[in-house]
Amino acid sequence: MRSIFRSIVLISLVIAFSLTGLGAHRHRPVARVTGPRELARAIDALLTAPEAAQAHWGISVTTLDGRLVYEKNDAELFAPASNAKLFTTTTALALFGPKATIETRVIAAGAPDAQGTVRGDVTLVGAGDASMSGREYPYNGTTERPNPPLSALEGLADELQRRGVRRVEGNIVGDDTAFPWEPYGSGWGWDDLQWSFGAPVSALTVNDNVVYLAIMPGARPGDPATVAWNPDVAGSYYSVENSARTSTAGSQPSLGVDRAPGSKQVRIFGTLPAGEPSKHLALAIQDPAEFAALAFRQMLEARGIAVTGEAVAHHRESADTAIYEQSVLRPLVLPDSRDTAESIQIAPPLPAGAVVLASRTSVPMLEDLTVTNKVSQNLHAEILLRLLGQRFGTDGSIVEGARVVRAFMRRAGVQPQDFFFYDGSGLSPEDRVTPRAMTTLLRYAASQPWSEEFRGTLPIGGVDGSLSDRFTRAPLRDHVFAKTGTLDEVNALSGYVTERNGRTLVFSILCNGHLPEAKGIPRTIDAIVAAATGADSVR
């Protein structure tokens, strides 16, 4: 979920990590277990390894009908990292249904006149569609981003051109007021906010609110490094202070990139050896609605549509003065779970007298939930949280979304004292959950009419998503369906696994407080899963 990068990307450090093989630790094959006592001994032995012994572990393993197979500290609270997404995505699937869609609109105060002139602002209105990107849908595990980053926005510009718009006498406005302007969750690290995994949350989202920066060495030592943006409009949005230089071929790269919170200046510094491949980074967009307006304005002008005004953003500042920890506990009555055959559409309100010049409908909800869980997409989970608050609470805010999730967890049988979330993605280090809450939720999901759809959103061991390089050998390959979670000193895995005898187990393994250099923790987690199923090894 979270990159190892801090405020400054030290590419030399990344290279050093890959060369030294810090992730190459291997466990011995797990001893075959035949009963609860043997399983407890096997897991306890795994947790006595030096890296694991220094950390704090919470484990819950149960059958689908709730019988306890193994537990360790399962009633204690842990930081879940991206395992928090399980709470957000199950709630969204149950309440919205798999077929729900979201509409983005381009509106104006009136239709174009006979000459194709629109008098007044043209407004791009977002309603929380996270699929406005170059991402491939449905998720296929290989070609995640084959399309141009702004292809969805280009389609809206094409629609205006087909409609005969020739001139806009006003501004191009990016409107994200469907949600209050709360771009970040509580406790998010300031050094995360410039990267893709910490992108700001907006009801008007394009390309996951991310642009791509390529940094290339010059021809000779001493030459300036060169930069290129994708999409090109990012070069108009961000300014670059570039002091990076080309170093001698074969020398160690030492390249840094930095953007201060709230700033639109990107600083590039350090060295990149001659002949070195380009370095590619995904940078968060500071203000997605403003960026979308700027990109849309340029697209219209590229199609011969004159625009007299500027590209501006329209936000709605939060007016909530209540204490979050109190507000989120207010009771809420939810509707019944959505029938899987039903389909609802979420659309922004249309002001009186306004006309829709163009519109775009998102992919079905299930397709986006799959991306959210498979690749652990933070922004998409945060948008889901706000959509839940908007539709089933009183506003598209963090606290209202959290109220909806909390109310749904009561329905799922999760004890209210067993979890507390400050966001929808798990990026907040302040989030807390017990392992037993995880397995309770997963058992509930397995009992619902949408259980197969939900399981299909999870990474599959050895096959796809964040588990593509774990559980790569039989019998666990293709038999582990689980959500990963990673933050500083946090590692987690929760989901389903099939035993040798065909029985499905539900598990949650939460590890907190390990040392940053403890690269073997995921291997320990995988070995615990293997022990629970009686598998000989995980690879």
Regions found by a protein language model. Give the residues of each.
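Bacterial N-terminal signal peptides
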Residues: 8-18
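Residue-level preference for non-acidic, small/hydrophobic
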Residues: 66, 85-92, 172, 204, ...
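Conserved serine DD-peptidase/penicillin-binding transpeptidase domain
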Residues: 23-50, 94-416, 500-501, 523-527, ...
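Bacterial N-terminal signal peptides that target proteins for export
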Residues: 1-9
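Short active-site loop at a secondary-structure junction
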Residues: 71-91
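A short, well-structured edge-of-sheet supersecondary motif
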Residues: 48-72, 312
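Small-residue-rich helix-loop
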Residues: 69-71, 160, 374-378, 382-539
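A short glycine/serine-rich beta->alpha loop
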Residues: 73-78, 282, 425-428
